[in-house]
Amino acid sequence: MELICIGLSHRTAPLTVRERLALPESRQVDVLQRLAQAPVEALWVSTCNRVEVYLFAPDAAMARQRALMELQVLGGVEALEHLYEHQGEAALVHLFRVACSLDSMVLGEAQILGQVKEAFERGQGAGAVRGELMRACAAAFSCAKRVRTETAIGRAATSMAAAAVQLASKVFDGLAGKTVLVVGAGEMGELAARHLKQAGASKLYVTNRTLSRAEALAAEVGGQARPFEELLGLVAAADVVVCSTASQAPLFTRDNVGALGRGRRGRPLFMVDLAVPRDIDPAVGTLDWVHAYDVDDIQKFVADNAAARAEEAQKAGVLVAQEVARFVKERALREGTPVLARLRQRAEAIARSEVERTLGALGDGLNEKQRKSIEAMGRAIVNKLLHEPTARLRAVGPEGEGNRLAGAAAELFGLLEEEVGTAAAAPSVMAAPVQVATGGK
């Protein structure tokens, strides 16, 4: 079994491509169930800045073909041109770095770990995250906790929502006296509301399709909740609008926002879209009085602040390397131990048989002490013969080496003949590979 990662992110793909693969949760589950046909395991990670599929599979080439087919169907051929791929230990390193927010647009942001955990839980619920992938994710979460504890990267970091509010403050030279609107009461909306309040916004409105969620958030931050049906009226009165909903189509278009212009009498409107797919149609930004930004624009804004966190990121990178090495070694031990156990059982059975044959041939000419000495000699020979292969398997470091040695031992000593025969008789659950042109990276 080998880990594969195929995906795209803000580093490789524009927002127009990423939002095509931003699936609602129900569709993510459908994809997982198609990909995770036993014995393949699958994880689908989707955030505003990345879409990645992780696969643990005995046939890496077959699993890769299936994933590429899904990504092509969902995102079109153009999406394939922006993909990156990692395999084996490199895929593990990438998973750990993503969970630790070392590959995020905003280095060190805390939200990504929660998003990966949600993907993990969704995968478990779909029966797609099992065994090795479950252990890899658990190790990545443990690594992220260690990074948060042992480095200052989280304390030094900002978030997408904080960056959006900083940009709004820069545009208006502060938010004192400004009316702000938060559209969406999820995690990103909650962060935006808190930062807007801290930045000194005079009036804070929160709206959400489910009014009770808007009311709960407004109560926490000292704002006012309004029904979603009042959305455009709220925008008409606002100076700043921050959007982060799960809508699959834009909430704001050039037509419905443009219709508000006459009543505003030229008063500028700052709109920032933290959603993927976007809540704000890009054409809205062509209105003279609207300053519209999306997540890619926020990336440019936060790039200047990344240097302050670079040193902590280096420390975190060392911890990631340590934790990946630990996981790889533990996995090699897990996979090597059954072979060692069968090898020892085989050797001990042979030793017992030969000792009994020898004792039988010698008959009654041996006393008890001599018989025990011969039995001890048989055990000692087994222990000495198996010491070196046992130590070698347990000391193995690089991923794949443990599998190679264990497989060689199993084949040389005929330890897996029964299992191989059973597996050969079992029908394949995977279809023939689909040829997909992968394009550039």
Swiss-Prot record:
PROSITE patterns per the UniProt record, alphabetical: GLUTR
Q: Can you tell me which residues bind NADP(+)?
A: 184-189
Q: Name one Pfam family in it.
A: Shikimate_DH
Keyword terms of this UniProt record: NADP, Oxidoreductase, Porphyrin biosynthesis
Picking any one GO biological process from the record gives: protoporphyrinogen IX biosynthetic process from glutamate
Native source organism of the sequence: Myxococcus xanthus (strain DK1622)
Q: Which HAMAP family match?
A: Glu_tRNA_reductase
> What does the record give as the reaction this protein catalyses?
(S)-4-amino-5-oxopentanoate + tRNA(Glu) + NADP(+) = L-glutamyl-tRNA(Glu) + NADPH + H(+)
Which additional comment does the entry carry? During catalysis, the active site Cys acts as a nucleophile attacking the alpha-carbonyl group of tRNA-bound glutamate with the formation of a thioester intermediate between enzyme and glutamate, and the concomitant release of tRNA(Glu). The thioester intermediate is finally reduced by direct hydride transfer from NADPH, to form the product GSA.
What positions does the entry give for substrate binding? Answer: 47-50, 104, 109-111, 115
Instruction: Tell me which residues this entry annotates as catalytic.
Output: 48 (nucleophile)
Role summary: Catalyzes the NADPH-dependent reduction of glutamyl-tRNA(Glu) to glutamate 1-semialdehyde (GSA).
Pathway terms, separated by semicolons: Porphyrin-containing compound metabolism; protoporphyrin-IX biosynthesis; 5-aminolevulinate from L-glutamyl-tRNA(Glu): step 1/2
The protein in question is named Glutamyl-tRNA reductase
Site (Important for activity) found at 94
Q: What is known of its domains?
A: Possesses an unusual extended V-shaped dimeric structure with each monomer consisting of three distinct domains arranged along a curved 'spinal' alpha-helix. The N-terminal catalytic domain specifically recognizes the glutamate moiety of the substrate. The second domain is the NADPH-binding domain, and the third C-terminal domain is responsible for dimerization.
Family stated for the protein in its record? Belongs to the glutamyl-tRNA reductase family.
- Under which main EC class is this enzyme filed? oxidoreductase
